Amino acid sequence: MKGVPRTVAVVGVPGTGKTTVCRILSGMVRHTYINYGELMLRVAGEWNLAETLEDLFKLPMDQQHLIWLEAAHRIRRLDYVLMDLHGLDRSPLGYLISLPVDIISPDIIVILESDPQSILWRRMADSKMRVRESLESLREHMEMLRTSMFVCSAVLGSVVSIVENHDPEEAALDILGIIEAAWAGDTTP
């Protein structure tokens, strides 16, 4: 790949620090920063279906899916996008890939990871965090996210990178380095 990557998807399990890292990164790149969940909430609000994330996730799955599709179509119309999303969500029925690969084809998929224990601590400290998992189920979720993003990458022809989030500033710089390497066409390990 050579040239500025048009779409960069930063994915990770809830509590891994995606939003913090993406907000820092958005000040370093020309891409428009989009938090997928916030965009879905905006769409739901415009359609008079939900005003809070809690309301959004109480909607029937078919309505959530329509909102998810509308958000994807809005993102697809943008030129340079930095997307912040989970990539894989856990539901009562199992896992759902939340990267809309039929509509958006990221040039780069960055899987942001943190130590699972740190993620659990962040989740407990965040009163808005609705996801509750055991350490074992969190590790499974992280592994399933990796697997699903590599499958998406194979289907889309995207590059996948894994970045550890020990420090948000450093993680943002690591992702910036990946974007710059793609821009330069550098695919050497």
From Swiss-Prot:
<keyword id="KW-0067">ATP-binding</keyword>
<feature type="binding site">
    <location>
        <begin position="12"/>
        <end position="20"/>
    </location>
    <ligand>
        <name>ATP</name>
    </ligand>
</feature>
<dbReference type="Pfam" id="PF13207">
    <property type="entry name" value="AAA_17"/>
</dbReference>
<keyword id="KW-0418">Kinase</keyword>
<keyword id="KW-0547">Nucleotide-binding</keyword>
<dbReference type="GO" id="GO:0016301">
    <property type="term" value="F:kinase activity"/>
</dbReference>
<dbReference type="InterPro" id="IPR027417">
    <property type="entry name" value="P-loop_NTPase"/>
</dbReference>
<dbReference type="GO" id="GO:0005524">
    <property type="term" value="F:ATP binding"/>
</dbReference>
<keyword id="KW-0808">Transferase</keyword>
<comment type="similarity">
    <text>Belongs to the archaeal adenylate kinase family.</text>
</comment>
<protein>
    <recommendedName>
        <fullName>Adenylate kinase homolog MTH_1663</fullName>
    </recommendedName>
</protein>
